[in-house]
Design a protein with these regions (language model features):
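Loop/turn elements at helix/coil->beta-strand transitions in domains of secreted/extracellular proteins
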Residues: 63-65, 77-81, 112-115, 154-157, ...
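Cap/lid segment of the alpha/beta-hydrolase catalytic domain
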Residues: 73-149, 198-199
Length: 282
């Protein structure tokens, strides 16, 4: 077996042990026991890792993506990277409950000698730009991997892991042949990756020519151009402070989708329920 294959298998085996539960959407309120466990995990992580939060990583068009980095304190050797890039909320501080969120994945990675890097997709939370599921995910993913490979603490080997939307962009970026893209674990990427006219598609929007209603409901909560944004000159320290005080997750009113999805034309469904204008307005 080739050395590169062995390295990839070892990377995948190690990353599989890191359950990326931090990026799942929140359920019920955490118990006191769970909050205590979160605090203990965060304290241990702080003792083992160099932590850089709200690093604004530049993309080729000048927009910057908000990124948190956790890497081993031992600087004697360069380390491989586990990379999670997501449209969902990974803020290190649970503003509602006044405690750290679950940082188990980050801690597990650092203990195994990996850096753990998580980035919000453009147009989400502290990242700049406007979210476009049909355009920027591929170029942003490739740019992020190249940026990480060039960091002085990196061994230029980046592996990705993630579920659903966080899985689908991996497949498209892998096809570009970035030499630093060493391994990938796309979990639950059932939506698929294809093309819609000139655009690469990050989701199976059409089946037999019919729009899939699942993605209309998903976009209702994910593609919101009307959101709070910080000035480009906001310091890293101020962004970190803001992330402890404000939860930028939108609180979308509930929708009876069994009725809403019967609206015609389909392109106006989100508008009809008071949602963001989204891609159908373009």
């Amino acid at each position: 077996m080739k050395t590169t294959q062995i390295v990839t298998i070892l990377f995948v085996a190690g990353a599989l042990a890191m359950v990326p539960g931090a990026h799942a959407q929140p359920g019920g309120a955490p118990t006191q026991q769970q909050l205590a466990a979160r605090n203990a995990t965060a304290k241990e992580l702080e003792s083992l890792a160099v932590i850089e939060r709200k690093v604004m990583v530049p993309m080729r068009d000048g927009k910057r993506m908000a990124t948190d980095i956790y890497r081993p304190r031992d600087a004697s050797k360069k380390v491989p990277i586990v990379f999670v890039r997501t449209p969902y909320n990974f803020n290190f501080w649970d503003v509602k409950n006044g405690a750290p969120r679950d940082l188990t994945s980050e801690l597990d990675a650092v203990k195994r000698g990996y850096a753990y890097v998580e980035m919000n997709e453009r147009g989400h939370f502290f990242s700049e730009g406007e979210y476009d599921i049909l355009g920027s995910p591929l170029t942003d993913g490739a740019d992020a991997i190249s940026w990480m490979a060039a960091q002085p603490w990196s061994n230029s080997k980046v592996g990705t892991i993630g579920c659903s939307s966080t899985a689908e962009w991996q497949l498209g970026v892998a096809a570009q042949g970035n030499p630093a893209f060493a391994a990938m674990i796309p979990q639950g990427f059932g939506a698929g990756v294809g093309r819609v006219k000139p655009y690469y598609e990050q989701g199976n929007w059409y089946r037999g020519g019919a729009v899939q209603m699942l993605f209309i409901a998903w976009l209702y909560g994910e593609q919101n151009q009307v959101r709070p944004m910080f000035p480009p000159n906001t310091s890293q320290a101020d962004l970190i402070q803001a992330s402890r005080l404000f939860d930028l997750a939108p609180q979308m009113p509930p929708v009876d989708w069994s009725k809403a999805l019967q609206h015609l034309p389909e392109m106006d469904i989100i508008k009809a329920v008071g949602g963001p204008r989204g891609i159908f307005a373009d």
